[in-house]
């Protein structure tokens, strides 16, 4: 089959993952990133289940292992900092699902760097620009960028995250966006300078407070802590804060978390000084189809499952693998030197590939997103009353004493049932 000319809008995890596979197949790939350089900000992510297998098939397992954070586990603490329950990391070499701490705890920036390093010599990267508009012409897709350049492509892939502009343009004017925000559910992230103490372990510390509030700290290096603050936060300040208005978002989180206990006051002081603060309005993206014509979506642009499922990064990798595999299956390699003399045949093959992508991967995402909606997405296991917090802490303590895997078995949706990772021999050929 002839070489495909592919444009990927978004240079994050999903965009780099699909670029890796398509360039390995010999296709002509351009990746757009609206930031002026590779975006390596973001906090700790993890890989689970099928995502780890995809990483191994990429041949990047060793490179990623070199970046793994050696987190010992997770512990719940009370308002005085006393440990309520401890859940160690789980060795899954003998099977089973991982715990709250996975074997692959990695900073987002390190994941992006590993994928970019493996792809940059095969793909064309354009930083500081993105797609402004596109028109599907049938035999190609005409794309105009924000730098005013215009070109034609065989396929446009939107890998531009939960607020995807490609998704909105694909759905068309007047069609409501398919991002569903969970009612009043917010999470904020930032880092603080905090040299490690002599007896301190690399640990996730979780504090649940009345009012459905949560404070968590994690350590990824000896000099700093990651801080996570949020919960179910009704209130006009956060609801009305403009996305990206950091000052107003900080004030909203400060108002919400004030007086919770444990290290909240200390973290609010650090929040005011943080220059890497980010507020996420938790929600999900759910579509009936991830493509239209010569436009396809991948990653959070297509199926954001929210941080509540613990499957965001894994879903990005597995979805990109399935999309590339179906393109390989129906469109073949791009380095065979064949002329593109029949655009309608290319269109037909692409249509089959994109349909196959949905057929293969949608059952996976249906399980990951099962039961989530604007209302049910707010089931955060965080009680509103002090009595509820006390009961929850006792339940968590009993679960830990019984050595049950609370996160792996009941919270994180790693165990996707009756779904097998497809084999695509074309992707594994050198």
UniProtKB/Swiss-Prot annotation:
Keyword DNA repair: no
Protein's recorded name: FAD-dependent monooxygenase asL4
Alphabetic keyword roster: FAD, Flavoprotein, NADP, Nucleotide-binding, Oxidoreductase
One Gene Ontology MF term: FAD binding
GO biological process: terpenoid biosynthetic process
Uses, biotech or industry: Xenovulene A is a natural product exhibiting little structural resemblance with classical benzodiazepines yet is able to displace high-affinity ligand binding to the benzodiazepine site of the gamma-aminobutyrate A (GABAA) receptor and could be potentially used as an anti-depressant with reduced addictive properties.
Family statement drawn from the similarity comment of this UniProt entry: Belongs to the aromatic-ring hydroxylase family.
Cofactor(s) it depends on: FAD
Pathway the protein contributes to: Secondary metabolite biosynthesis; terpenoid biosynthesis
Entry binding sites for FAD: 11-14, 33-34, 108, 278
Pfam families in the record: FAD_binding_3 (PF01494)
Known function: Flavin-dependent monooxygenase; part of the gene cluster that mediates the biosynthesis of xenovulene A, an unusual meroterpenoid that has potent inhibitory effects on the human gamma-aminobutyrate A (GABAA) benzodiazepine receptor. The first step of xenovulene A biosynthesis is the biosynthesis of 3-methylorcinaldehyde performed by the non-reducing polyketide synthase aspks1. The salicylate hydroxylase asL1 then catalyzes the oxidative dearomatization of 3-methylorcinaldehyde to yield a dearomatized hydroxycyclohexadione.
Disruption phenotype: Severely reduces, but does not abolish xenovulene A biosynthesis.
Cofactor binding: number and manner: Binds 1 FAD per subunit.
Domain of life of the native organism: Eukaryota
InterPro entries per the UniProt record, alphabetical: FAD-bd, FAD/NAD-bd_sf, FAD_aromatic-hydroxylase
Enzyme Commission numbers on file: 1.14.13.-
Induction comment from the UniProt entry of this chain: Expression is significantly up-regulated under xenovulene A producing condition.
